[in-house]
Amino acid sequence: MEHLPTIKIRKNGISLFSALLGALGLAAFWIPGNWKYFLLLFVCAKVFYSLSLVFYDSMLNDVTTDERMDNVSSVGYALGYIGSCVPFIISLGLVLIGEKIGFSISTSMMIAFILNAVWWIAFTIPIAISYKQKSYIEKQDHVLKQTFGRLYHSLKNAKKDKKIFLFLLAFFFYIDGVYTIIDMSTAYGTSLGLDTTGLLLALLMTQIVAFPASLIFAKLSKKGSSEKLIKIAILAYFCIAVFAIQLDKQWEFWLLAFAVGCFQGGIQSLSRSYFAKIIPDASSGEYFGLFDVCGKGASFLGTFLIGFITQITGHQNIGVAAISVLFLIGFFIFNKVSKME
């Protein structure tokens, strides 16, 4: 494989800078304005959030060994899930009972947005200070040109390395299904008659369940193959999508949310650590750029499938169940990857 070592830019610095800009965008959500202003802020916050994750994910190669990577990645996701519940619960409480304690809904929303922005930065600073980067070379001239050139070479190298390429392809399909279920869950719950409070509580339950479930995956990864655990998680999501065919009651939606929480952290954390183990450490930044493009930019396919099938059949249940195809394709390709040396 053609190797191009990472340009000497500090991942922790860029991750912190991206998080700061993303948090500023989030904190500014409460400022009155029209929908175009809000959309611009939302896009900025989302872009910088995703950029910060590219560098955050690529740090995995520097902070642990291959043997401990599955465990570290899973515990990281677990702590992230339970940690995010704190500002979520406070924000939810403000929105639900704010008027009873003298806050208008706009004031409650303002406090919620600022609280989440501060929380984001507060827990980004420690890793920015303590992280020690191992793999990079001296800074070169024409950094922007070099960066895009290196991204192009990483993509070319990924195509040459069949295992990396096929994993990214498998990941694109099955994670598309995962993120589609996450993104479309509120719309689906609304169609079943859940009010805003019910939807938020269901999402909170998913986060809470994901905490111990991710820790269980961390324990299992020490005893067994991460490939087998990823396959189990993909098949579980396939069953979740198929279950949606007959879903027409609120308690079934809650059961679905619980099942998603059981496997969400596992499939995300083990996919990240598996990818980290098959890429060259020196180019982890560029490769994780490809990884996050496949992940964060994937859910359009599942959303299109749901909309298209729902339009044809007139039944949203069948539309949601259609994304089971994505899990089958992802499983088939990943099964080939797991058999490669």
PLM features: what roles do these ranges have?
Residues 94-118, 308-327:
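A membrane-interface helix-boundary motif in multi-pass transporters
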Residues 29-42, 245-257:
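Helix-loop junctions at membrane interfaces in 12-TM secondary transporters
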Residues 119-130, 321-341:
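Multi-pass alpha-helical transporter architecture, strongest
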Residues 132-168:
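Juxtamembrane intracellular "pre-TM" segments in multi-pass secondary transporters
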Residues 51-64, 266-279:
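Intracellular juxtamembrane helix-capping segments at the cytosolic ends
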Residues 73-95, 294-302:
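Glycine-rich segments within core transmembrane alpha-helices of 12-TM secondary carriers
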Residues 1-9, 212-226, 310:
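Helix-to-loop junctions at the C-terminal end of transmembrane segments
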Residues 13-27, 228-243:
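Structural signature of the two symmetry-related core transmembrane helices
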